[in-house]
Amino acid sequence: MTTAFRRLSLLPLLLALAMLVALPGAHAASSSTGSKPHRVILFVWDGMRPDAISAEDTPNLLALAQRGSRFEDNHATYPTFTMANASSFATGAFPGPLGFYGNHFWAPGASGLNAKGAAADFRDPIYTEDYAVLRDLDAHFDHELLELPTLFAAAQKAGLTTAAVGKSGPAFLQDYKQGGVIFDENTALPLAFAKELQQAGYALPAHTANTYPSDQLSLREDNDSPTEQGKMVTLKDGVTADATAAAETTPAPANAWMMKVYLDVILPKHRPDLSVVWLRNPDTTQHLYGVGSPEFHLALKAQDELLGQLEARLQQLGMAQDTDVIVVSDHGHSNIAGPRDLFPLRQINDGRVAGIDNDWGYSVSGGIRLADQLAQAGFTAFDGSGCMYVPVMSGLRAGGSPLQQTRYDDDGRLCGKPGAYTTPSYLVPEILPKSALVIASNGGTEYLYQPEHDAALIKRTVRFLQSREYIGAIFVAKRYGDIPGTLPAESVHLENAARGPDIIISYAWDADAVIQGYRGTEYASQANERGEHGSFSPIDVHNTLLAAGPGFQQGFSDPLPSGNVDVAPTIAALLGLSLPKAQGRALREALAGALMRPLTDYQVKPTTLQPRQPATGLTMQRIDGSALSATSFDFAVKLKQLDADGKSWTYFDQAGPERH
């Protein structure tokens, strides 16, 4: 890791903007100065870590940070998933009050089609990075997919034009009521815009054909699939990502195509007052190959090149002087790994896992399939997935033996088709047993649902989870009262009696463990990937936030805590909009002119939340089955409280276990 930007924290930008809307008498630049509101482009670098900004990989982003405002202590919304943070960007609020829990959550009873035109499976936990699934869920929830108003709706009501571009799911969520131009990996909306692109000679996302009746829109024969993702480079086993690969990153061509459409058509012809451009890099690349891998650096360079294209186009169109560009990530990103004493890092030679190399090796461990862990302990659990074959990421122990043995389904009766597997199928059955637990697997954090809300079963499940080393923090729905060793979901803004899960767990993490030069590892939902997020690790929680333009101070480093929940209120302040139900604040300390509020007006108070009492008398186990000497489980949530004018905002830094 190099660089010039490591000391520049990107986080406080969100705070200033959010405060502006929240504080009495706060209005946009247009109302306070009489000038035209600034155009705002929110450019989301999915999964971008602040410590990945460098002169070598991201010179354009580094330059923007140095000339504009940098937020040194920015916080992703927990859980640190893409769609949870997308909902915060959309509304300035948290998942509990919104009733939206992405990326996977359980919504039995919903129905409809997905972007591919096939029936969406809502019996199992549903994956929400799909515009059609989001429309299905909106209908299921009486057209209140998000239970608070959105920034895009406020902008459109005020007569402003909007554009949402990029990654399927989070881009669409910004404008899920479909009031402006939408162009994502699966569709182009509205119909007039889709036809406009066709007439101009641009190919449409291949699944756009499923958005409209065939008599309204059909794809040209040469349309191709411009937003299709490339294939992962694997080891010789055919399923595990080869962390040494150094080919073009899988999302790069699709990202470049969507940016081209934005720069060539949407920006000059539609001239949106508010844009969200959300692209997959470096997140998808980090998932597949890991943070610090050769592909990781290629992904950063590809994304930075697109930022350079955006800035050059704004200059060419004469828009640079009245456009605020905000660069933010939805979350940080960690490598998936278990404790080094159990699972040392390994070399990769010729597509195969080789000898131990704890100095510059790659992880071969850290995947947890919680449904399987619960089933082995006698619980009835389902996670909505079939058989999994994870030959490497399931873990090679120090002695060289696999943690999970490979088995074979010779006739396909168990897995649906013949083949090797390491864990069996846990699809949700048509008739769900009353004692069942349904798990929505989300990477670094899991949601557990108990349809009958059986308090005794919930307590027994919590007790089991507390006895496992791979569990870092446990939150429970308020209906279950005070369970030792847990905190209520409302303590981290995850309460929602109608839609929320019964148990929320963050997997354990190690913020100091280093792989390929980057700190941060965590246990995560089992898959053949090397990177993950979603946990309450400080690496996942602390993300990138930078801004430059006429609405922001130049060369300003904001030391105050800020969060993704502050982005929408900040943009609302810049555009003269009202978001009265937003829970974030306008980051006024970083704003320019009449909107600015000095740093001296704020007070920051670090504090800690802990369960009222620990869980005691436990028999603790590690992931390999060995015993821990500890017999009690507790955890601590570290946070900061920011105060100004009698108002308070809370920013969560991390939550981790304390075993005794």
What positions do the PLM features span?
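Short, structured active-site-proximal loop/turn typified by the sulfatase FGly-forming signature C/S-X-P-X-R
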Residues: 51-104, 161-165
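Polar, surface-exposed loop/tail segments
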Residues: 469-503, 559-562, 566, 576-610
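Low-complexity, glycine/alanine/valine/leucine- and proline-rich hydrophobic stretches
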Residues: 519-548, 566
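Phosphate/adenylate-binding glycine loop and adjacent helical scaffold
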Residues: 597-660
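His/Asp/Glu-rich, glycine-adjacent segments
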Residues: 94, 100-290, 438-440, 444-451, ...
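Secreted, luminal/periplasmic, and some membrane-associated catalytic domains
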Residues: 79-81, 103-112, 116-140, 153, ...
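A long, amphipathic alpha-helix that forms part
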Residues: 248-277, 282-323, 335, 350-363, ...
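Bacterial N-terminal signal peptides
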Residues: 9-22
